[in-house]
Amino acid sequence: MSSKATKSDVDPLHSFLAGSLAGAAEACITYPFEFAKTRLQLIDKASKASRNPLVLIYKTAKTQGIGSIYVGCPAFIIGNTAKAGIRFLGFDTIKDMLRDSETGELSGTRGVIAGLGAGLLESVAAVTPFEAIKTALIDDKQSATPKYHNNGRGVVRNYSSLVRDKGFSGLYRGVLPVSMRQAANQAVRLGCYNKIKTLIQDYTDSPKDKPLSSGLTFLVGAFSGIVTVYSTMPLDTVKTRMQSLDSTKYSSTMNCFATIFKEEGLKTFWKGATPRLGRLVLSGGIVFTIYEKVLVMLA
């Protein structure tokens, strides 16, 4: 069994294009889970609304129309496309910088560091502003007097109004929890994927510069998604609260953590874990599979 890896630098443009296509496809397919997760995180503790994500999706679609579960979807797709492109570009670039100069191997620790760097990069460049728009739109849709929905102004004008109202500081409010979440997400997700992929390649004596089969890639990506959800959910909940329309009630990220814990309890940090699990399991499988396939096509 070979213990050596062939160093394979990924072309930056190919990495960005493959990541962007994977991100766009994943966003279109999994958005209802993202919608349900965000709504569950915004539901008041005293509310009698169902906490079952499938029931929430069904009732929302039934009472408000199927389009209601895609509120904020355009912003999410654009953000996810940019995010995934930046993520894989950053990960592959940092990964190649951290490889062992003699063997081309990337240790588990270095894989986590590469994921951490990619997560920080994507959080500032793409995730924070687009997540702020998505969260505000979902929150606004459920309010008694929606400002950015059902006003006859159209999607583009409503999005523009929201961006103007929030301003730069509003779009980047919550950048700390977003950066913490994305850094943790990608450190766990990409680090886990890279490590398991390497173990499989070592076990099967497969070349390190070739992707796994589509089935294995999907399974490894899905498993990485499961690990990511439960280890980073508290950061995701705080991020959502800091980007909601009521975010001004929290003076800082730490104050948000403390307030949720004091007023709603520890379990609240994992509210929305089930739909997020559904999305990230699918997301992990879809993103890594499409990414690997597109890289092969572009090679």
From Swiss-Prot:
First and last residues of every Solcar repeat: 10-97, 109-199, 212-297
Keyword Transport: yes
GO cellular component: mitochondrial inner membrane; mitochondrion
A molecular function (GO) term: citrate secondary active transmembrane transporter activity
Pfam family, one: Mito_carr
Membrane topology annotation: Multi-pass membrane protein
GO BP: mitochondrial citrate transmembrane transport; transmembrane transport
InterPro entries for this protein: Mit_carrier, Mitochondrial_sb/sol_carrier, Mt_carrier_dom_sf, TXTP-like
Keyword tags: Membrane, Mitochondrion, Mitochondrion inner membrane, Repeat, Transmembrane, Transmembrane helix, Transport
Function of the protein: Transport of citrate across inner mitochondrial membrane.
Homology family: Belongs to the mitochondrial carrier (TC 2.A.29) family.
Protein name in UniProt: Tricarboxylate transport protein
Organism listed in the record: Saccharomyces cerevisiae (strain ATCC 204508 / S288c)
Lineage of the organism: Eukaryota, Fungi, Dikarya, Ascomycota, Saccharomycotina
